[in-house]
A protein has these predicted regions:
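Conserved beta-strand positions in the central sheet of alpha/beta enzyme cores
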Residues: 2-3, 57
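Conserved active-site-proximal phosphate/metal-binding subdomains
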Residues: 8-11, 16-34, 40-197
């Protein structure tokens, strides 16, 4: 079981910090629990292990590895990030599932009032849920290529190295709250060594 705290990048359904959630989950279950959310360095790994997790799960740190297939500009934006936001803007097929992202043109356009997104966009996202798993991949790929910050129907696909460049401004740049503490792109094997307590 993975206890994912609110600090995590990507889809975040709760509002409890990683360490607090880990404590609650461990008290409720008898199976091993892994911890995720906001862990980017050896100290973070050590903290969750000392709190009883059997392992740490690090998404954003490995997004910024040489082996990651994330779009190069997505990686660059992560390294330059000063903040993250919780939004429901990129929720086609994922209604009611806020996601933590780095701001881009789409978030600047549609999150002007500090909310998680306009109510009508969130309502449209709820309506798409039954269709999301039934839409053929070929249609989803075409939709991604046409996605623009000015169009309010924004899907959950992050920019990849083989995807359209436009997704860097119109797609979700998923990143954990502590992305601001990451300063380099390293080989995954080197990261594993550096993260091991």
């Amino acid at each position: 079981m993975i206890a994912q705290g609110v600090e995590a990048g990507g889809h975040v359904r709760g509002d409890t910090s990683t360490l607090d959630l880990l404590e609650r989950v461990r008290a409720a279950v008898t199976i091993p629990v892994l911890a995720a959310g906001g862990i980017v360095d050896r100290e973070g790994v050590r903290a969750v292990l000392q709190a009883g997790a059997v392992a740490a799960v690090l998404g954003t740190r490995f997004l910024l590895s040489e082996e990651s297939c994330a779009h190069p500009d997505y990686k660059r934006r992560c390294l330059e990030a000063e903040t993250t936001v919780l939004t429901e803007l990129f929720g086609l097929g994922w209604p009611g599932a806020p996601h933590r992202v780095i701001p881009n043109a789409a978030t600047r356009r549609w999150l002007r009032d500090g909310s998680r997104g306009p109510g009508w966009i969130r309502a449209a996202n709820r309506l798409t849920r039954p269709l999301a798993s039934r839409i053929p991949d070929s249609i989803q790929v075409r939709a991604l290529k046409g996605q623009r910050p000015s169009r309010p129907f924004l899907g959950p696909q992050p920019p990849t190295e083989d995807g359209p460049d436009s997704l860097v401004e119109s797609g979700p740049l998923y990143a954990g709250a502590n992305v601001t503490h990451i300063t380099d792109i390293s080989p995954a094997a080197q990261l594993v060594r550096a993260l091991t307590p």
